[in-house]
Amino acid sequence: MDNLDQLVQQAQADFAGVSDSAQLEQAKARYLGKSGALTEQLKGLGKLPPEEKREAGAAINRAKTAIEAALEARRNALREAALLAQLAAEALDVTLPGRGAQGGGLHPVSRTLERIEMLFRSIGFIVADGPEIETDWHNFTALNTPENHPARSMHDTFYLEGRDDVLLRTHTSPVQIRTMLAHVKRHAEAAAMPEIRVIIPGRVYRVDSDATHSPMFHQVEGLWVGEKVSFADLKGVIADFLRKFFETEDLQVRFRPSFFPFTEPSAEIDVAFMSGPLKGRWLEIAGCGMVHPNVLRFGGVDPERYTGFAFGMGPDRLTMLRYGVNDLRLFFEGDLRFLSQFR
């Protein structure tokens, strides 16, 4: 009995001295394992006389119960200590300032499109829209582009697979036709047709990619049709827009004679970089001209009574000029390090 009491006390002391569960399991094995001290006591019961066996067995069971109780108590203490340590490590300092939500921002090209729309709305234009998947008729035929024109080639235009009459629009000009047809139909009973004055922002697609071109890019089409609309009106509108867009009177702008099948006469508009490595270079930002009589006819407008001008400008390139960016592709790579500068 004395030996069993000492064994229990020794086990309790060993359990109390361990610092983790692995050490506790090792201590348990020394007393309750297959070769443990208490197990050896149980094995020795068979050698005792029958009259002593019952009393010795009861004493060993009491000792085993005491050791198991000490083991479980220490196991619970270690679990609680581990939990407290984890809570302390993961504790939140409620006195620290909270993390504010990081604000997003518009894409720089979206900013430019909004600015263009705002400036043209201020002089009486409205915003129109149309499909990006267009018919060959709206994209080419109705815009006075003959069947053998190079722009119709698959090297320049994305056609839908299996269809040679459906394509991704190469410009926003098809919306001119849709707008004129709808406008003429709406005012068919009027003695005089009200003016058409619209801008058409949207994505367009061409087979092209370099520092100043992208296979997908944005374009803003402008159309003004009415009685006695002239090229002087076109130059005045464009010059006024550019001065307001760049917020300066000191702007290098030039109109170059050009050719487009849907306008006559036609011109291209160039603006010079004002800073950066490309300073002094001229960059084309728009094509423009007086709407060709054939295009007016396709739109249902009488070219003998009405004239109009149209322009198509690249807001992507205007964004390059406004922010001093030299590679158009940077706008579409999705690099937040670049885009976050424009918030």
Curated annotation (Swiss-Prot):
One GO term describing the cellular component: cytoplasm
Predominant location: cytoplasm
Enzyme Commission number(s) from the entry: 6.1.1.20
One annotated GO molecular function: ATP binding
Cofactor(s) named in the record: Mg(2+)
Cited CDD domains: PheRS_alpha_core (cd00496)
Protein's cellular compartments: Cytoplasm
Cofactor: how and how many bound: Binds 2 magnesium ions per tetramer.
Catalysed reactions listed for this entry: tRNA(Phe) + L-phenylalanine + ATP = L-phenylalanyl-tRNA(Phe) + AMP + diphosphate + H(+)
Binding positions for Mg(2+) per the UniProt entry: E264
GO biological process: phenylalanyl-tRNA aminoacylation
Sorted UniProt keywords: Aminoacyl-tRNA synthetase, ATP-binding, Cytoplasm, Ligase, Magnesium, Metal-binding, Nucleotide-binding, Protein biosynthesis
Family, as annotated: Belongs to the class-II aminoacyl-tRNA synthetase family. Phe-tRNA synthetase alpha subunit type 1 subfamily.
Subunit text: Tetramer of two alpha and two beta subunits.
HAMAP family linked: Phe_tRNA_synth_alpha1 (MF_00281)
NCBIfam families named in the record: pheS (TIGR00468)
Protein name: Phenylalanine--tRNA ligase alpha subunit
